[in-house]
Amino acid sequence: MASSTPSSSATSSNAGADPNTTNLRPTTYDTWCGVAHGCTRKLGLKICGFLQRTNSLEEKSRLVSAFKERQSSKNLLSCENSDRDARFRRTETDFSNLFARDLLPAKNGEEQTVQFLLEVVDILLNYVRKTFDRSTKVLDFHHPHQLLEGMEGFNLELSDHPESLEQILVDCRDTLKYGVRTGHPRFFNQLSTGLDIIGLAGEWLTSTANTNMFTYEIAPVFVLMEQITLKKMREIVGWSSKDGDGIFSPGGAISNMYSIMAARYKYFPEVKTKGMAAVPKLVLFTSEHSHYSIKKAGAALGFGTDNVILIKCNERGKIIPADFEAKILEAKQKGYVPFYVNATAGTTVYGAFDPIQEIADICEKYNLWLHVDAAWGGGLLMSRKHRHKLNGIERANSVTWNPHKMMGVLLQCSAILVKEKGILQGCNQMCAGYLFQPDKQYDVSYDTGDKAIQCGRHVDIFKFWLMWKAKGTVGFENQINKCLELAEYLYAKIKNREEFEMVFNGEPEHTNVCFWYIPQSLRGVPDSPQRREKLHKVAPKIKALMMESGTTMVGYQPQGDKANFFRMVISNPAATQSDIDFLIEEIERLGQDL
């Protein structure tokens, strides 16, 4: 009888083969091992055991070896990895009778802690793998009332008594199951997308360290990383490496608020102690296409939204410098004191870049603080091909830059950069003696917490620093160039098709591609209020169908008097041309009968 072990002769002919083994060719071994690996560990081992009992000794060796190879290659934390410390090998653990009190720091809690965390890591790794699998849905949509009522054992209500670790693991799985896969290559809904593996590792480490950024004393390495990274970012903006300051904040809205606080303190330092009653009637300026956080800061800081003056924009969403200067003169004539303007480098909807050079000229003429909100567009500074779109940014007094947007750093990661050293410290310092003692044994200038408006501050720097180390500046440049190339591909693909209409003429400056889908019923229909009313309903209907099917996600919104349109943004380096093609085909499929 011929051996069942694969050989050149065995693969070319089945003559003389054992009839009990001819149905288990090498491809079948792989298939069954793949099935086993896809099951829970216990069931997977049962499958292998069954296959072992029904094959010869040689088959047993083949099957077990194949399964072990699959396990070790796909799950480095599995118990088959004999090189690992025995304490960190997976064992069969009954979590139904274990509770949080059984984990560390409980006495003899190490084994349960290790096994529990290995299960959590397995859940996370499975989620990561599926996130990059295009056959996986972007979301499994449910209405709020469905999730609140409970889904298949997933209950959001809090209980008085502890639940088992088995239930906690189920809750971990279901939380991911019913969420949105923002790292999926076909998720285009927000400016912040993607799932960077190095950044993910950095965030895991950050949470494990669980420290605060307010002093060098408790976060020495993280504080130094932040200083070095902020210095590098200021150099990329174009400022002197010796001067300047900055801090990471909880998002671009807070970074923008910091800029207004710094400007106000620069011109009117007495506001810190005496309040707004001690200063003249101040006004600040921003474009009608700028982020709403500028108006929100105006309300929060006591200026009032009426004193946040909106500057007109052209058809591409860029500030009109002449209107800016006219509004300065108008405010001065009314007795107001202009002191600040926000220019946007990459608007949220159109992706427009305001003319920073011309705005800077006006600021110098009238002695205004120039802030550049580059939360969305700042990443283009990393690209030699595209950084010209931010020409003049080096003339700004402050800059907001969100690496968690175009650079793909995991949320949250936003920096406020200030050209003049000492402004943030002077503006926000309160000298709390229980935190910021002046007589410590190290250089207390590294205690950065007093220049923040927060006390507790999350460590946002490590994942960013780690990604920069892993990619290098060139890696970020390539990533950003690729996303912009995909936007150009999308624009070229739809600009001349009858079923699509561009919101504005010309190629987009950023990865924002704004367009209407025109259903068959509206094609060729002249513009009128009735047509616009019908068109206004198209994007929301397609978006709703999109979410129900879970295949992809893209945002929509109105702008001024324009009907709802799709705003496609690309910041996920995992996206490809095939994903752009899929999105367009999906919009056509979902909208064809509207």
Curated annotation (Swiss-Prot):
Pfam families per record: Pyridoxal_deC
Cofactor annotation: pyridoxal 5'-phosphate
Phosphoserine: modified positions: 78
Compositionally biased tracts (Low complexity): 1-13
Gene Ontology molecular-function annotations: glutamate decarboxylase activity; identical protein binding; pyridoxal phosphate binding
Sites bearing N6-(pyridoxal phosphate)lysine, chain numbering: 405
Keywords associated with the record: Decarboxylase, Lyase, Neurotransmitter biosynthesis, Phosphoprotein, Pyridoxal phosphate
GO process terms (BP): gamma-aminobutyric acid biosynthetic process; glutamate catabolic process; locomotory exploration behavior; social behavior
EC supergroup of this enzyme: lyase
Region annotation Disordered: where it falls in the sequence: 1-23
Ion transport is among the record's keywords: no
Family statement drawn from the similarity comment of this UniProt entry: Belongs to the group II decarboxylase family.
UniProt function note: Catalyzes the synthesis of the inhibitory neurotransmitter gamma-aminobutyric acid (GABA) with pyridoxal 5'-phosphate as cofactor.
Assembly with partners or alone: Homodimer.
Protein name stated in the entry: Glutamate decarboxylase 1
Species whose genome carries this gene: Pongo abelii
Name of the encoding gene: GAD1
